Amino acid sequence: MLPIAKLEAVQRRFQELEHLMCSPAVLAAPAELQRLNRERTEIEPVVVAFARMRDVERRIAEDREALSDPDLSELAQAELPELELERERLAAELEVLLLPKDPNDTRNTVIEIRSGEGGEEAALFAADLFRMLCRYAETKRWKVEVLNLSEASAGGYKEVAALITGQDVYSHLRYEGGVHRVQRVPSTETQGRIHTSTATVAVLPEADEVDVHIDEKDLEISIAASGGPGGQGVNTTNSAVQIKHLPTGMIVKCQDERSQLKNKAKAMKVLRSRLLELEQRRQEEAQSAERRTMVGTGERAQKVRTYNFPQNRVTDHRIGLTLHKLDKIIEGDLEELIGALRTHRQAELLRRGGLSGPALEPAT
């Protein structure tokens, strides 16, 4: 049974938000306008689906009334089953849409990819993963901005960080967090032996300055000449920035830009996102183990996926899904994989009757 009173309240809130966003006071405050627009965007699918269901219910009532009319009964009888199926579909959609939302889901996202076990092959795999996510971002019309890039001497990346901006970025990429494993024959392998390597992906919701306050006295900032693979200079200026957050010991480096100020701004962006994630994880630790084991929590030590090149196979270990289309997935065709993870998470939430708080998945 759908909570009609709750749906009507959401409808009223949507109308209120549209009114507020037109007020001069809000238009003069960009941060407040952004906050209200984020809320409006989040509840709009509920309002649209509820309006469609109300329209379907109205048509069902009209058709039932028309059954007693000899001129209209045949048409009404033909239309009713289709309308009733549509009502059931919309009711199921609304049930999912009303699940608790993670406030991070509409945020932009910082991704950090680091090579793990496997030496040179791990660095190449880290580069493959970054390229895969960039290609996926292209299909979603998201923007990718490199924040930091450390190349390995034999190719690939020791680590790479990027900010991905667009609609509902975090709600899709949250599932990429964890340890990714690759099984393939390296180009340098003369006997055809399969090597196993890993790379770790961290997925962080972008933090605004209002989300995380950082005191300048808690920062230790050092400047150096930027460096590339094999000690080669990326540029000749002292523009590379390293920031250490003294209370937590976190260290962030950025050397992607020629401007020291731009590198510092990018490093601060990553630091804020890491601190926001740290605080949210502390809060989650106080919650049930059941919630923490849900798909999409992005635990960094969790083995999430294996990419087997000889078999053209990708296996997601969290939901036991195997797809024999690695060649397409590594080129950014992640829609089927991420869609299955989102569906699985929604099913978990429905089965458990919904859970509140920041690890939950929005419906689209």
From Swiss-Prot:
GO MF annotations in UniProt: translation release factor activity, codon specific
Residues found modified as N5-methylglutamine: Q232
Predominant localisation class: cytoplasm
Location within or outside the cell: Cytoplasm
Pfam families xrefs: PCRF, RF-1
InterPro entries, sorted: PCRF, Pep_chain_release_fac_I, Pep_chain_release_fac_I_sf, Prokaryotic/Mito_RF, RF-1
Post-translational modifications: Methylated by PrmC. Methylation increases the termination efficiency of RF1.
Keywords for this protein: Cytoplasm, Methylation, Protein biosynthesis
Gene Ontology CC annotation, any one: cytoplasm
Gene3D superfamilies listed in its UniProt record: 3.30.160.20, 3.30.70.1660, 6.10.140.1950
Signal peptide span: none
Similarity comment: Belongs to the prokaryotic/mitochondrial release factor family.
Function: Peptide chain release factor 1 directs the termination of translation in response to the peptide chain termination codons UAG and UAA.
Name used for this protein in its record: Peptide chain release factor 1
Organism: Sorangium cellulosum (strain So ce56) (Polyangium cellulosum (strain So ce56))
Lineage: Bacteria, Pseudomonadati, Myxococcota, Polyangia, Polyangiales
